């Protein structure tokens, strides 16, 4: 009888053969791919609603995007379904990756990694939502109305959906700033004091990264920078608070050990 595939995290002390590791990897890849295919199938089934969501940021005076050629309606709908499927299945994919690499972490590293991994899908969805509800509408309005007296503007569906979904994905990735900073602080790579001291360079890096997003106008650039800077500042506050709590816990533990040693020590002769 074939062995039951593993779907649980392996303990740090557990030792597996190469074949066992490959079987574990295969199972988790199948689960991740299955989740992606299921979510993409649902998005394909509800493709009309998906396209309505994508088209909503367009200004009212702009007609619906157009397609060219016989196959483009099919391929555009297929790519939209894949993008939405990836977004919906991301928590499952991240968990499968985390569960596979978890045995390589020591117990101390696992205490750092577990809460940070749990933050990733929520921050990603937060970035996507911020982009959709705050950034996309002013961005499309500005870009489509710019010098519009000189152009007969028509939007190609494939280009527009790629623009929207790429911008949303980029903002979702950009919202991972707290994960990167907290991980660096917890692993001793940097400190809150160094982050505060080099704040100006961090803001410059954020501005450069935001400039590479598909929305190239200055107004949208500011809209994209503001939450990233706030997340950077929040990360400094959180990392400082965590460091302070850990320092207090270490001090209490040292005091408890010292008190226990005093109790065990024999009484001095009178």
PLM features per residue range, with description:
Residues 1-270:
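Membrane topogenic/interface segments and analogous intrinsically disordered interaction regions
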């Amino acid at each position: 009888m074939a062995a039951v595939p593993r779907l649980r995290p392996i303990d740090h002390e557990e030792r597996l053969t190469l074949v066992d590791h490959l079987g574990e990897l295969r199972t988790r890849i199948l689960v991740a791919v299955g989740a992606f295919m299921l979510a993409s199938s649902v998005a394909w089934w509800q493709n009309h609603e998906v396209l309505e969501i994508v088209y909503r940021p367009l200004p009212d005076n702009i007609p619906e995007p157009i397609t060219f050629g016989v196959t483009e309606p099919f391929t555009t709908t297929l790519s939209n379904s894949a993008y939405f499927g990836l977004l919906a299945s991301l928590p499952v994919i991240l968990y499968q990756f985390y569960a596979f690499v978890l045995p390589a972490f020591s117990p101390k590293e696992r205490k750092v990694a577990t809460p940070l991994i749990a933050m990733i899908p929520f921050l990603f969805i937060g970035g996507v939502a911020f982009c959709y509800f705050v950034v996309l509408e002013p961005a499309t309005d500005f870009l489509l109305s710019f010098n519009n007296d000189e152009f007969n503007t028509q939007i190609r569906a494939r280009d527009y959906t790629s623009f929207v979904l790429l911008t949303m994905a980029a903002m979702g990735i950009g919202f991972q700033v707290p994960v990167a900073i907290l991980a660096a602080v917890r692993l001793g790579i940097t400190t809150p004091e160094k982050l505060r001291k080099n704040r100006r360079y961090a803001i410059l890096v954020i501005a450069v990264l935001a400039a590479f997003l598909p929305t190239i106008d200055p107004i949208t650039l500011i809209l994209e920078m503001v939450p990233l800077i706030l997340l950077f500042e929040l990360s400094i506050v959180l990392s400082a608070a965590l460091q302070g709590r850990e320092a207090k816990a270490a001090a209490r533990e040292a005091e408890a050990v010292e008190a226990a040693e005093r109790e065990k020590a024999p009484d001095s002769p009178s």
